[in-house]
Amino acid sequence: HPTYSPDMIEKKYVDAICRGEGEIYFLELIEKLENNEDFYATKNFWFKKEDGSIVKNPIGDLVNNLDEPPRPDRALMYDVDDSLRARGTKLFMATRGCPYKCTYCFNHAYNKLTKGHGDMMRYRSVDSVIEEIREVKDNYFLDRVNIDDDIFLLKPKGWLEEFAEKYPK
């Protein structure tokens, strides 16, 4: 993963990497490319120039409101991979982050990298998660929901109760 192994930019076949979250800055990069603007100063990105030099941009702000970014376009996976589409277990995320410093986990390094760029723990609303589950269920085979958070039980007060009430419906 380029966030933790940014030296992969030195590989012959790599021209750019995104470190950290990409939703905000990838869109910014695309807009700059579409408008023929200088894109080499896009936060979260490292670029390899034609002369081989590497531009290392700083980390930008984290996405604090996880309801804002568009949800993953699952058609990109499920419409091209029959085995993924047929698998009944689908993954969802309700939070990002973890406050703990377990030595075997990446989160302590990620928290150090992104310190000062936003809240360590970020959450989606229950309604947003339920809406995504419903959308997937309406379009794909779904018999098991896997909420793939780094730490599922660490939620704002009342979140789990609200989810437990709304999910069965």
Model-derived features: positions:
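Radical SAM [4Fe-4S] cluster-binding motif and immediate context
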Residues: 67-169
